[in-house]
C-alpha cells in the first residue's frame, strides 16, 4: 500500500469525485439492470446472449454494487444510507446492512460471525451457511436492538420492513417490464 501520500485530514468537500462516483452508482445500476431486462424481453436474442447478459449483470451488481453499498452504509448521511439500501434491494440482499453493521463488525473472526469462514471450511459449505445464517443473525440483532428500546421486533422502526418493501418493489418492477 502506498500510504506515504495519505492525508487523513481531508474534509468531505475535498472528496467530491470519490463521493460523486459512489452516489451516482445506484441510479446507473438501476438503469443498467432494468435496461438489460427490457432489452432481453423486447429484442430477439439467442438464449446464450441472454444468459451472458444476466451473468455479466450479476457480476456487475455483485462486485461493484455490493461494494458501493458497503461503502455507503458506513456513511452517516441519510442519502448515502438510502442509496446503500437501494443497491442491496436490487440484488435482494437487503439484510446485509444489518448483518454487516450489527453482527460482522462486532463478532468478526469469531464463531458468532456467519461471514467468517471456519478453518478448512470449503467454499460451498461456507456459501450455503452464509445464505442461511446471515438473514437470521441480522434479524436477531435488529430484534435485540429494538428490545433495548423496549420495542418488539414487529415495531415499524425495524428496518426489515424497509428491506422487504424495497425488495418487493424491485421484484414488482422486474415483472412489469
Model-predicted segments: where are they?
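Transmembrane helix-loop junctions in multipass membrane proteins, especially transporters and channels
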Residues: 37-45, 74-75, 110
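Membrane-helix interface/capping segments
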Residues: 2-11
Amino acid at each position: 500500500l502506498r500510504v506515504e501520500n495519505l492525508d487523513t485530514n481531508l474534509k468531505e468537500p475535498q472528496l467530491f469525485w470519490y463521493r460523486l462516483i459512489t452516489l451516482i452508482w445506484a441510479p446507473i445500476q438501476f438503469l443498467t439492470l432494468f435496461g438489460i431486462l427490457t432489452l432481453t424481453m423486447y429484442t430477439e436474442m439467442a438464449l446464450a446472449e441472454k444468459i451472458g447478459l444476466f451473468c455479466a449483470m450479476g457480476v456487475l451488481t455483485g462486485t461493484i454494487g455490493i461494494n458501493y453499498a458497503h461503502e455507503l452504509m458506513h456513511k452517516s448521511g441519510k442519502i448515502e444510507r438510502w442509496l446503500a439500501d437501494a443497491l442491496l434491494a436490487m440484488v435482494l440482499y437487503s439484510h446485509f446492512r444489518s448483518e454487516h453493521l450489527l453482527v460482522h463488525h462486532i463478532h468478526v473472526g469469531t464463531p458468532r460471525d456467519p461471514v467468517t469462514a471456519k478453518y478448512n471450511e470449503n467454499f460451498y459449505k461456507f456459501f450455503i451457511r452464509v445464505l442461511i445464517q446471515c438473514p437470521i443473525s441480522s434479524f436477531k440483532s435488529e430484534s435485540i436492538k429494538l428490545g433495548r428500546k423496549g420495542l418488539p421486533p414487529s415495531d415499524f422502526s425495524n428496518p426489515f420492513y424497509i428491506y422487504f418493501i424495497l425488495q418487493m418493489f424491485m421484484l414488482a418492477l422486474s415483472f412489469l417490464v
